[in-house]
A protein has these predicted regions:
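ABC ATPase NBD coupling module
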Residues: 67-80, 91, 103
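Conserved ABC ATPase "signature" region
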Residues: 109-127
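Non-catalytic connector elements of ABC transporters
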Residues: 237-334
């Protein structure tokens, strides 16, 4: 199957500061891809380029195997971006939602199509058609912005923190609606979000972006420096509660340590490093049926994984204090 996106040797910077540096990255059509990373990691910049709003300084982004320029005809009506802060034009809800179709000169049965788009995001057309942009709450504005994109039935819907600054009810509607678009029309979804558990639950692929580079996929424990050497040959990260998270010698003091959740064990192996924390969440992973354990150890979140056959050996619940162990040899570096 041909990739809908193929990134090749992409580099971008702002005022001399590197923003993105991606050698290769691809997305297949009809899939859901999650992008996770801290603020300033380059997520928003990347989504703007995948929407063909901005152009990288170097490298190529192929769309369905072909080069594309910002706002070019072969991508203009096929990709659309929903940003964290929705931009609505200074006009009625109806005019905001119908605008894209009017640009396409595709205006047949417009009232019913606008009403259907509003229904998808849980807003009644009779109540909202004539409302002005300034009469909407934050959650309503985000839902109207999403409806204005869904009415186009896009091939690709890119979402940048779509639920970060709205009420819980609107956030859930948006989550449900974008999945409906993917199921109903085969829309390719690319989602940047701090809601890691939502992404892990719905995405075929989750990629981690840091300082403009992809450095891992799937559930991993990423532990950021700086690292401290309290004794010769012993390297640790000091946590806020006084615990030390031990690692092998890092390649640099700001290197990122990576530990696979499968190597975080509920045991007290005397040869292993240990860390104590509180269970904050238990998640049943749909694809593997494994139990995902989210543990908070002071200021560090840690993920462990239990296979179905081992899950019955433990009685776990949120709020419970547990001790996790790992081996130094299981720590890798980025």
């Amino acid at each position: 199957m041909k990739n809908i996106y193929q990134i090749q040797n992409l580099q971008h910077h702002y005022n001399g500061h590197p923003a993105l540096d991606i050698d290769s990255f691809s997305i297949q059509p009809g899939t859901i891809t999650g992008i996770i990373g801290p603020n300033g990691s380059g997520k928003s910049t990347l989504l703007k380029m995948l929407a063909f709003i901005d152009k990288p300084r170097k490298g190529n982004i192929l769309f369905k195997g072909e080069s594309a320029e910002p706002f070019a005809e072969n991508v203009r009506f096929q990709t659309t971006l929903l940003s964290q802060e929705p931009y609505l034009m200074k006009r009625s809800v109806f005019k905001n939602i119908s605008y894209g179709l009017e640009l396409r000169r595709d205006t047949h049965d417009l009232p019913n199509r606008v009403n259907d788009a509003l229904s998808l995001v849980g807003l009644p057309g009779n109540d909202f058609f004539h409302r002005k942009w300034y009469e909407l709450s934050g959650g309503e504005a985000q839902r109207v912005a999403l409806a204005s994109r869904l009415i186009l039935k896009p091939e690709v819907l890119l979402l940048d923190e779509p639920t970060a600054s709205i009420d819980a009810a609107s956030a859930q509607i948006i989550k449900d609606t974008v999945l409906l678009a993917q199921n109903k029309w085969g829309t390719t979804l690319v989602i940047a979000s701090h809601d890691w558990e939502w992404l892990y639950d719905i995405c075929e692929h989750v990629a981690h972006l840091f300082r403009g580079r992809f450095f891992g996929t799937g559930r991993q424990n990423f532990i950021f420096g700086p690292w401290w050497e309290p004794a010769p040959g012993k390297w640790v990260k000091k946590l806020q509660d006084g615990q030390s998270l031990e690692v092998p010698c890092p390649p640099s003091k700001d290197a990122i340590a990576i530990i696979n959740p499968e190597n975080m064990l509920l045991s007290t192996d005397k040869k292993a490093c240990t860390i104590q924390g509180t269970v904050t969440r238990l998640v049943l992973e749909k694809h593997t049926r494994e139990i995902i354990i989210i543990v908070q150890a002071a200021n560090q979140a840690i993920t462990a994984r239990l296979s179905p056959k081992n899950a019955h050996r433990y009685t776990l619940h949120p709020g419970q204090k547990i001790r996790l162990s790992y081996l130094l040899e299981d720590v890798t570096w980025y």
